[in-house]
Amino acid sequence: FDHPMLTESAATLHRPNGVSLGTALPSNELSQELARRLRAETEGEVLFDAPSRGRYATDASIYQIMPVGVLIPKCARDVATAIAIARDLKVPVLPRGGGSSQCGQTTGAALVIDNSKHLRKVLAIDTENRTATVEPGLVLDHLNARLKPHGLWFPVDVSTGAQATLGGMAGNNSCGSRSIAYGNMVHNVLGMRAWLSDGSELDFGTVATASGRVAQIGSFVHALAHEHRAEIIARWPKV
């Protein structure tokens, strides 16, 4: 299963000039241009009508933020193309899985990319090394159903296993009721192939094996965490 370790998961954090983050939507003209280009340059479903956007404005949380629009990609190439278009038009992107989070991570004034419909394959199962390689939209329970005949099980057992996708769980660093014994996602994921905001496609893995730009990103995030360590410790809930 592919996903980066936590210290490597953040890429370049620079905000491009003109990008509006949070709850502010772009102009109607910009939204229309985004929809036009997505329909022309991708094979995915492009949803910019009010009812569709309304469905994606919320998740299992109490938050509600209307997205710019929605792309349901049919292949990885659609995702890469959408990121390139959004970068060109300075529109934020927001990947979405099952929308089962209770903290609002999948809501925002952005182009929502819903990976749960088509990008949900189990690409490989290595029984000898006890690993699986999957697409981000695969639901946890579906993975475990494929693993069961091999006597294997993915132990990050979130309560929403029938809806939560592996990509969303990785981004959320999910845990589950057995995390004391098995750890959370960061302890059960070996690597990830991902696109950065500039369109680069990189293979992330452990810090020990990182090189080139992947190592630079890891060092940047590590330094950022160290810089704000005292503030993080002070504000992290004591449970």
Kindly label every feature range from the protein language model.
Residues 2-60, 85-93:
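N-terminal accessory segments
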Residues 121-125, 131-239:
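FAD-binding subdomain of flavoenzyme oxidoreductases
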Residues 65-68, 127-131:
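Short, solvent-exposed beta-strand edge segments and adjacent coil->beta transition regions
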Residues 38, 50-119, 155:
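Glycine-rich N-terminal segment of FAD-binding domains in flavoprotein oxidoreductases
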Residues 31-32, 79, 140, 188:
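Generic non-transmembrane alpha-helix signal with a bias for helix starts/N-cap capping motifs
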